[in-house]
A protein has these predicted regions:
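Local sequence-structure signature of Cys/Sec-based thiol-disulfide redox active-site neighborhoods
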Residues: 19-28, 275-278, 366
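Long, well-ordered hydrophobic secondary-structure segments characteristic of membrane-embedded
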Residues: 74-85
Length: 449
């Protein structure tokens, strides 16, 4: 019996059936891994990757495509996207590549690998704040001090990976090789990864790329349904510091989602408002390709999650215009600090989007809202949000002025603005309370205001 025939027999005997043609390499992977890691194989079998060849994906109407790369290597076209197709990309730049049963395999699948088929999405993501999330902490001494001195004092690398860097991402590196045992007791050599596991949005991968597609599309089903549901976002965007999910859950939109969401169609592209779903989730407003029932596009798909946002609401002392790109450590305020505002709220003169861009982005977001709401409702909503931001910023400014008195009198040391008791009270004022109030207004969850 040949190995390929053996692989097919394994599928049949175990009740599994590949939904599309497998490459010889992937078939061999599955012949072992359906025993070694059966959950992974079953999850993959439920995926669109297992059911659709690349050629089939490219033959879809452009607006319905989930593949954006135009010139995909021919050898991949006639097969479904399997183990080998993802874990054998760009082997010359993967420091985690190793010889595994006569194949060169990467442990970590990175955005650069996903770009083989999803080039546009990866390019868009590379400009986002999410892609630079780890550097936003590490390369900005102000935020780095907040993490190391205030939020995770006396920490170790593993603790960092479970706290701030669990969401922001770690830098995954290879320490060397190690021996592990299969279920049959066989020994195999695999790379020993540092700062792993991690699926933070700004993870630095062994090939040098930034990001983790599995933050939103968990392996190995890579489901668009999972990515569109708010539970996925809630992994990182929840209270106390980023209470987006909590606010959404208590909003009218969240009420309707919780009550009716099980009846919606989560897999269609484009996603038709009023037909596939009734109220927005995080993905609807921030990145999904949304159309009306006549097929007219309301919002184009984007993986730059800030591209429809004009005001930055969370994580910083004051609300302010969005930064022009994700490399926010390059911002400089009037005091020379890498921040978008001064401690008293004055905006940095460069690096933030201008009023014209703010209007354009607000128009994009309003277009989604206007699919269900009247102009007066939408205008009133955003007017309330702007006033709430101003009120929250004013309260933070009052707290900051009290703190400045402490700094000026020597009661607190201004060298590190985050490590003393009075400073920690000030952090709570903007990181927890002001953030909650801003979010509450943006997403109509009034109890959090």
């Amino acid at each position: 019996m040949t190995l390929n025939t053996f692989g097919i027999s394994i599928f049949m005997l175990s009740g599994l059936c590949a939904m599309g043609p497998l490459s010889d390499e992937t078939e061999e992977c599955i012949s072992c891994h359906e025993t070694e890691t059966p959950g992974i194989v079953q999850d993959w079998l439920s995926s669109r990757h297992a059911k659709t060849t690349v050629l089939d994906a490219l033959e879809k109407e452009r607006v319905e495509r989930r593949v954006s790369t135009e010139n995909i290597v021919e050898k991949y076209m006639e097969y479904v996207v399997g183990c080998y197709e993802c874990h054998s990309q760009n082997i010359n730049v993967h420091t985690d590549n190793f010889e595994h049963f006569d194949y060169n395999i990467n442990i970590v699948v990175s955005p650069k690998d996903c770009a083989t088929c999803h080039e546009t999405e990866v390019d868009e993501y590379s400009h986002s704040k999410k892609a630079h999330a780890i550097d936003i902490l590490i390369k900005n001494p102000v935020y780095s001090a907040l993490v190391t001195e205030s939020l995770t004092p006396h920490h170790g690398k593993n603790i960092e990976g479970e706290t701030c860097y669990g969401c922001h991402g770690t830098e995954v590196s290879v320490r060397g090789m190690k021996t592990i045992h299969t279920k049959d007791g066989d020994e195999i050599e695999v790379p020993d990864l540092a700062n792993w596991p991690n699926q933070g949005v700004g993870r630095i991968n062994p090939d040098g790329s930034k990001g983790s597609c599995t933050s939103c599309h968990p392996r190995h089903s890579f489901s668009i349904e999972v990515a569109r549901k708010p539970y996925t976002c809630s992994e990182c965007h929840l209270e106390p510091d980023v209470p987006a999910y909590n606010v959404y859950k208590e909003s009218k939109h969240g009420n309707m989602y919780m009550s009716l969401g099980s009846k919606w169609n989560w897999n269609e592209v484009p996603w038709v408002i009023g037909e596939d779903f009734k109220t927005p989730t995080c993905a609807t407003c921030h990145n999904s390709l949304v159309a009306d029932t006549e097929g007219e596009i309301i919002a184009t798909r984007t993986h730059d999650f800030g591209s429809r946002l004009w005001t930055r609401l969370f994580g910083l002392i004051y609300s302010h215009p969005q930064p022009k790109d994700g490399q926010t450590w390059n911002l400089r305020n009037k005091d020379g600090l890498p921040m978008p505002t001064t401690f008293t709220g004055e905006l940095a003169e460069t690096g933030l989007i201008d009023e014209t861009e703010q209007v354009a982005r607000k128009s994009k977001m309003s277009g989604v809202c206007l699919s269900c709401h009247s102009t007066s409702w939408v205008d009133g909503h955003f007017r309330q949000m702007e006033e709430q931001n101003q009120a929250a910023d004013a309260m933070v400014l009052k707290a900051t002025q009290h703190l400045q008195k402490a700094w000026n009198s020597g009661v607190a040391n201004a060298e590190n603005p985050f490590d003393e008791y009075i400073e920690r009270l000030w952090i709570e004022q903007w990181l927890f309370y002001a953030n909650s109030a801003r979010y509450a207004s943006a997403m109509s969850g009034p109890d959090y205001a």
